[in-house]
Amino acid sequence: MNKLKLIFAGTPDFAARHLAALLSSDHEVVAVYTQPDKPAGRGQKLTASPVKELALTHNLPVYQPASLRKEEAQAELASLGADLMVVVAYGLILPKVVLDTPRLGCINVHGSLLPRWRGAAPIQRSIWAGDTETGVTIMQMDVGLDTGAMIRKVTCPIAANETSTSLYDKLAELGPQALVDTINAMAAGETAAEEQDDALANYAEKLSKEEARIDWSMEAVAIDRCIRAFNPWPISWFEVAGQTIKVWQAEVINSDHGQPTGTLLKADKQGIDIATGLGVLRLLTLQPPGKKAMSVSDLLNSRRDWFEPGTQLN
């Protein structure tokens, strides 16, 4: 097997886990690209990405262009003489000239079984839609949005209580080994790519805080999926007594209620039961304004007046 010279491009922790796997492989990471440092925290202090932090601990050259569309940035990348560029949740668009620069092009690790869930939020949308299976796809990048030919797929089940946090961790365990296996196969000239069927494609739109507002007219199972999909961001929410309450955890109670949707049916230490379009949703872990997430029993100790049975939620 030939040893390949790699450029790695990525930004969040998910990407850093893949970089770590490459650093333990037989290949050479010659440079790392990541997003420019961004303000974070209450002090809005400029903060390096997880990928940059890992790269610096390994004394790797780090490049942080705001765009790869400028000739200067493209020439700089070309001067690295890489065989392959690996892209994992980088966050910048790669122009065709960049895609064509490395000898073997650019490959991407995507958190879904393409062509299902192309786009920005595949992990969240797979839970939101009620999928029972997802996985990681390694693809050869082209100029489209997640449209490139697929080199390798690995699958994993989506559990009934899966959140985006837990599924993210599952895929972050699966992806790195799949990536290393793919690069090893490419180095040996043993890969075969499969074109995507565009007729089977759908798009994982970005999440928004407004979308996370709970619609009690939906079925309880659908609301529960939203709550799990929007954890850890933007967190599903509703309003009661003029307060915005975030919902971190709930469960579906299969019972008829005969009440208008959004009616608060009962509130006790087991949970807060809400009438939905079909079935009852029991709220288990809530976060009131300015507080950390807490169990319903803890919240009722201080704010039972917000959750009187018969209260109508918007």
UniProtKB/Swiss-Prot annotation:
Organism: Aeromonas salmonicida (strain A449)
Protein name, per record: Methionyl-tRNA formyltransferase
Family under the similarity heading: Belongs to the Fmt family.
Positions with a binding annotation for (6S)-5,6,7,8-tetrahydrofolate: S112, L113, L114, P115
One GO cellular component, as annotated: cytosol
NCBIfam families given in the database record: fmt
UniProt keyword Ribonucleoprotein present: no
Annotated SUPFAM superfamilies: FMT C-terminal domain-like, Formyltransferase
Gene behind the chain: fmt
Any one GO molecular function term: methionyl-tRNA formyltransferase activity
PROSITE patterns: GART
Pfam families hit by this protein: Formyl_trans_C (PF02911), Formyl_trans_N (PF00551)
UniProt entry keywords in alphabetical sequence: Protein biosynthesis, Transferase
Protein's UniProt keywords contain Transferase: yes
Function: Attaches a formyl group to the free amino group of methionyl-tRNA(fMet). The formyl group appears to play a dual role in the initiator identity of N-formylmethionyl-tRNA by promoting its recognition by IF2 and preventing the misappropriation of this tRNA by the elongation apparatus.
EC number: 2.1.2.9
Cited InterPro entries: Fmt, Formyl_trans_C, Formyl_trans_C_sf, Formyl_transf_N, Formyl_transf_N_sf, Formyl_transferase-like_C_sf, GART_AS, Met-tRNA-FMT_C
Top enzyme category: transferase
Catalytic reaction list: L-methionyl-tRNA(fMet) + (6R)-10-formyltetrahydrofolate = N-formyl-L-methionyl-tRNA(fMet) + (6S)-5,6,7,8-tetrahydrofolate + H(+)
